Amino acid sequence: MLTCVPGVLEKDDVADFRRIMDAAEWEDGRSTAGAQSALVKRNEQLPPDGDLARTLGNRIISALTANPRFISAAIPLQIFPPLFNRYVASDGHHFGVHVDNAVRGDRMTGLRIRTDLSVTLFLSEPDDYDGGDLVVEDNYGSHEVKLPAGDLVLYPASSLHLVTPVTRGTRVASFFWLQSMVRDDHARSMIFDLDTAIQSLVERLGRDDPETVKLTGIYHNLIRYWAEV
């Protein structure tokens, strides 16, 4: 399931992020890549253990925990500290096809997660750069994603994916992973669809409508059946 979540960060927050990040020191993005990914990764990152990345990452996590659509789609158990990258056209940056590591560990906190979902939060407007599309492959084909700044996309971390070469401008984003309470993507997708339908019914019929209450009970029982906490 590939899901877009609009407006995770307000435009003023994005501008503040960019002001801070544009003045920062960046390093070779291959420093956090696995052996296979390092062969096809050409970009830059903020030092992942630096105070700047941690401070900005905490702001993102705060925004995520207040976003109902993100919570509904991801059902997060653990969120890996967000990382930050940029792709600069003049440096020929791109990221060839790869799959993310199944387990990620954070050196500073000792946190280890199973990477159920990969997340990209866009921090550049689509008009600011050419190329730089996130391309995610699944059983239904390839999906090209290029969202407004402040929006994010969630997709299964098991997916093959790539970032096409940036040919003009600079693409800046945050990327990270999370472990969901519901491991199976198909089950998580069904729960998300059910929750979306329930919220629509609540708007039309009210939260105390008997059928809405019944469906809400089914939702929680499915979570209870599948959740690993």
Curated annotation (Swiss-Prot):
Q: Which GO terms describe its biological process?
A: DNA damage response; intracellular iron ion homeostasis
For this UniProt record, give its keywords in alphabetical order, as a comma-separated list. Dioxygenase, Iron, Metal-binding, Oxidoreductase, Vitamin C
Q: Where is the Fe2OG dioxygenase domain?
A: 78-180
> What note does UniProt attach to the cofactor annotation?
Binds 1 Fe(2+) ion per subunit.
Q: Which InterPro entries match?
A: Oxoglu/Fe-dep_dioxygenase_dom, PKHD_C, PKHD_hydroxylase, Pro_4_hyd_alph, Pro_4_hyd_alph_FE2OG_OXY
Residues the record lists as binding 2-oxoglutarate: 171
EC number of this enzyme? 1.14.11.-
> Which top class of enzyme applies to this chain?
oxidoreductase
Cofactor(s) the protein requires to work: Fe(2+); L-ascorbate
Positions annotated to bind Fe cation: 98, 100, 161
Pfam families under this entry? 2OG-FeII_Oxy_3 (PF13640), PKHD_C (PF18331)
Keyword Transit peptide part of the UniProt annotation: no
GO MF entries: 2-oxoglutarate-dependent dioxygenase activity; iron ion binding; L-ascorbic acid binding
Q: Tell me which NCBIfam families the record gives.
A: PRK05467.1-2, PRK05467.1-3, PRK05467.1-4
Annotated protein name in UniProt: PKHD-type hydroxylase Nham_1514
| Annotated source species | Nitrobacter hamburgensis (strain DSM 10229 / NCIMB 13809 / X14)
Upper taxonomic lineage: Bacteria, Pseudomonadati, Pseudomonadota, Alphaproteobacteria, Hyphomicrobiales
